[in-house]
């Protein structure tokens, strides 16, 4: 699934292309996404300028004068710029057509979303998909104290607590394993048992890992590409544990282990990461 670095990389790629430009047409070839695309959405947005782009967690935000379009890339989706004369391929479900550019949503599994939040419903942060999200990892308020306060009394494993997104957003399955390795924390450790210093190390690891991923254009394991069609390079360059089961830890040489938590694969070093 595209995680925060992939979504932010996409936003940075499309922002100079569409901000200030008028959307001439929204072409919906397949409305049956995770939630149905509203039938009136093309008429609501035709000939309307994009005022700004944004992101909340893993959601892309396209701001118009009368509301905000919420776009989620699902499990395997991508949003990229294509040539004006490029024919759609299989699984190319939505086009944003501007005078000199087309953005195309490709989503083989149709787990993504293209939704609309009118200004009359209040700020977009109050949308049901966004209102329960935790703090952004690069918010100055996010630190060890923040994590320690939000993890207090939680019996769930720290890996699961990160994935839930209530304490901090954007740490998906790939980066959760990487962050915990960087912090030296066993992913099975109950979140509520982490000391304040260990929470501080984890907060620092989250920021550093996501910053590295952003600098590398995100991660590409199977489907993700950026706005220009380029794959992310983080996984090939930086991955310490993810999908390295049985291989030697890059730090101590101990074989990396794999386990399943909440039906998701977790990777860790049993020597470097302590409970």
Swiss-Prot record:
**Active-site annotation:** 2 (schiff-base intermediate with dna), 3 (proton donor), 58 (proton donor), 264 (proton donor)
Entries under InterPro entries matching the protein:
DNA_glyclase/AP_lyase_DNA-bd, DNA_glyclase_Znf_dom_DNA_BS, Formamido-pyr_DNA_Glyclase, FPG_cat, MutM-like_N-ter, Ribosomal_uS13-like_H2TH, Znf_DNA_glyclase/AP_lyase, Znf_FPG/IleRS
Reaction catalysis annotation: Hydrolysis of DNA containing ring-opened 7-methylguanine residues, releasing 2,6-diamino-4-hydroxy-5-(N-methyl)formamidopyrimidine; 2'-deoxyribonucleotide-(2'-deoxyribose 5'-phosphate)-2'-deoxyribonucleotide-DNA = a 3'-end 2'-deoxyribonucleotide-(2,3-dehydro-2,3-deoxyribose 5'-phosphate)-DNA + a 5'-end 5'-phospho-2'-deoxyribonucleoside-DNA + H(+)
- Quote the SUPFAM superfamilies the UniProt record gives: Glucocorticoid receptor-like (DNA-binding domain), N-terminal domain of MutM-like DNA repair proteins, S13-like H2TH domain
Pfam families per UniProt? Fapy_DNA_glyco (PF01149), H2TH (PF06831), zf-FPG_IleRS (PF06827)
Free-text comment on the cofactor? Binds 1 zinc ion per subunit.
EC number(s) per entry: 3.2.2.23, 4.2.99.18
Sorted UniProt keywords: DNA damage, DNA repair, DNA-binding, Glycosidase, Hydrolase, Lyase, Metal-binding, Multifunctional enzyme, Zinc, Zinc-finger
Q: Which domain of life is it from?
A: Bacteria
User: Which residues are listed for DNA binding in this entry?
Assistant: 91, 109, 154
Protein's UniProt keywords contain Lipoprotein: no
> Could you say which residue ranges form the zinc fingers (FPG-type)?
240-274
Database matches in HAMAP family:
Fapy_DNA_glycosyl (MF_00103)
Concerning its family, UniProt says: Belongs to the FPG family.
The UniProt function text for this chain reads: Involved in base excision repair of DNA damaged by oxidation or by mutagenic agents. Acts as a DNA glycosylase that recognizes and removes damaged bases. Has a preference for oxidized purines, such as 7,8-dihydro-8-oxoguanine (8-oxoG). Has AP (apurinic/apyrimidinic) lyase activity and introduces nicks in the DNA strand. Cleaves the DNA backbone by beta-delta elimination to generate a single-strand break at the site of the removed base with both 3'- and 5'-phosphates.
Q: Any idea what this protein is called?
A: Formamidopyrimidine-DNA glycosylase
The encoding gene:
mutM
